[in-house]
From Swiss-Prot:
Subunit structure: Homotetramer.
Keyword Transcription recorded: no
Positions contributing to ATP binding: 9-17, 118
A GO biological process held by the record: argininosuccinate metabolic process
UniProt source species: Chlorobaculum tepidum (strain ATCC 49652 / DSM 12025 / NBRC 103806 / TLS)
Protein name: Argininosuccinate synthase
Signal peptide annotation: none
GO terms assigned for molecular function: argininosuccinate synthase activity; ATP binding
Domain of life: Bacteria
Catalytic activity: L-citrulline + L-aspartate + ATP = 2-(N(omega)-L-arginino)succinate + AMP + diphosphate + H(+)
Family named by the database record: Belongs to the argininosuccinate synthase family. Type 1 subfamily.
GO cellular component labels: cytoplasm
InterPro entries xref list: Arginosuc_syn_C, Arginosuc_syn_N, Arginosuc_synth, Arginosuc_synth_CS, Arginosuc_synth_type_1_subfam, AS_cat/multimer_dom_body, Rossmann-like_a/b/a_fold
Length: 401
């Protein structure tokens, strides 16, 4: 029997570190190809490679995905207004299909026979990875160690890692599970599993506690071109740099902390803590610019599309014809979404200070209540009669109702 060559989505965290050793034991003689994608998370690449090799990987591949992530994933979600259940900007969920694609690309190039990930059997990510694998490499075998192995808790994994000298940062005193990329950080496990327990200070990774944030506010001007952020405070910037800077400014001012109970793909509710300063600010600014530039029916209908798009991302069906169809609709709506939004960041809050656009549909002469008013008030009477005619007729016929 030929030996397996297994491509592992490797993060260097507890699960994937333990997983390499476990796979080596289960598939005797297997060659492990560790693949790490850079989505903007903090990491020490040299140490990561050393850790992977020391843990048992035959080779290590590091793929810089940041530019692709911003331009082909994040901006699409932002333009769509994709916030899962009106809160979560989908940082982890957005990164999974791109990481899956990177893993498949390396696996095919290296002649691997199997794909594997470090996702739990009751989480969302197993669905996201495996649905992506099915779309991109349907012929390849997939193994999910966390659904098979003997460990039933993170504490047991930590003990296993210590027994086998596997270097991991998680400890029994620091049990948080953390996933990070440039669009946000997710934190779960430990005391956070009790929805009545306020997140301890050490759970937050980048944001300042609002009460400890600067006493002076930070004002930012964000410019968009057809729905895409292109400049910050008058300076043209690449998307990656703009997000990095907004993360810094937002985090400094305590902006971007999210605490939600969300509905997972597998049917359970989970408590999630997120830090997403740039994502929170940009979604807020983008929506306000849309209010100014989109025709009423488009603006209102697009809110439904945003929810559909968020569900699609969250549920792991990024590589679907539906996403492409929604992209076409969204791109059409974004043609007039050009302009600037001014926001004040202060002690955990965002306050809209102003917005402007060459495509603004706001007509001050029609909206004003001063003598400059050009609205034809006499037209209102006839409009109201026609507008309410259906209801009037209904209630004349159905007097008891």
């Amino acid at each position: 029997m030929s030996k397996e060559k297994i491509a592992v989505a490797y993060s260097g965290g507890l699960d994937t570190s333990v997983m390499i050793k476990w796979l080596k034991d289960k598939y005797e003689g297997a060659e492990i190809v560790a693949v790490t994608g850079n989505l903007g998370q903090k990491m020490e690449v040299d140490n990561l490679e050393q850790k992977a090799i020391a843990t048992g990987a035959k080779s290590f591949h590091f793929v810089d995905l940041r530019k692709t992530f911003v331009e082909e994933y994040i901006w699409k979600a932002l333009k769509a207004g994709a916030l899962y259940e009106d809160v979560y900007p989908l940082a982890t969920a957005l990164g999974r299909p791109l990481l899956a694609k990177a893993l498949v690309d390396v696996a095919l190039a290296e002649g691997c026979t199997m794909l594997t990930h470090g996702c739990t059997g009751k989480g969302n990510d197993q669905v996201r990875f495996e649905v992506a694998f099915a779309a991109l490499a349907p012929h390849m075998k997939v193994v999910a160690p966390l659904r098979e192995w003997e460990f039933t808790s993170r504490e047991q994994e930590i003990a296993y890692a210590m027994e086998h000298n596997i270097p991991v940062s998680a400890t029994k005193k620091n049990p948080y599970s953390i996933d990070e990329n440039i669009w946000g950080i997710s934190i779960e496990c430990g005391v956070l599993e009790d929805p009545m327990v306020a997140p301890p200070a050490d759970a937050y990774q980048i944001t300042t506690a609002p009460e400890l944030a600067p006493d002076e506010p930070t004002v930012v001007d964000i410019e968009f071109a057809q729905g895409v952020p292109v400049a910050l405070d008058g300076q043209q910037m690449e998307g990656l740099d703009l997000i990095v800077r907004l993360n810094e400014l937002g985090a400094m001012n305590g902006v971007g902390r999210l605490d939600m109970i969300e509905n997972r793909v597998v049917g359970i509710k989970s408590r999630e803590i997120y830090e997403a300063p740039a994502a929170t600010i940009l979604h807020f600014a983008h929506r306000e610019l849309e209010r100014l530039t989109l025709e009423k029916s488009v603006f209102q209908y697009k809110r439904n599309i945003g929810q559909d798009y968020a569900n699609l991302i969250y549920n792991g069906t990024w590589f679907s014809p539906m996403r492409k169809a929604l992209d076409a609709f969204v791109d059409e709506t974004q043609k007039p979404v050009t302009g600037m939004v001014r926001i004040k960041l202060y002690k955990g809050s965002m306050t809209l200070l102003g917005r402007t656009s060459p495509n603004s549909l706001y007509n001050e002469a029609l909206a004003t209540y001063t003598e400059a008013d050009t609205f034809d008030h006499k037209s209102a009477e006839g409009f109201i009669k026609i507008y309410g005619l259906g209801l009037k007729t209904f209630h004349e016929v159905n007097k008891s109702e």
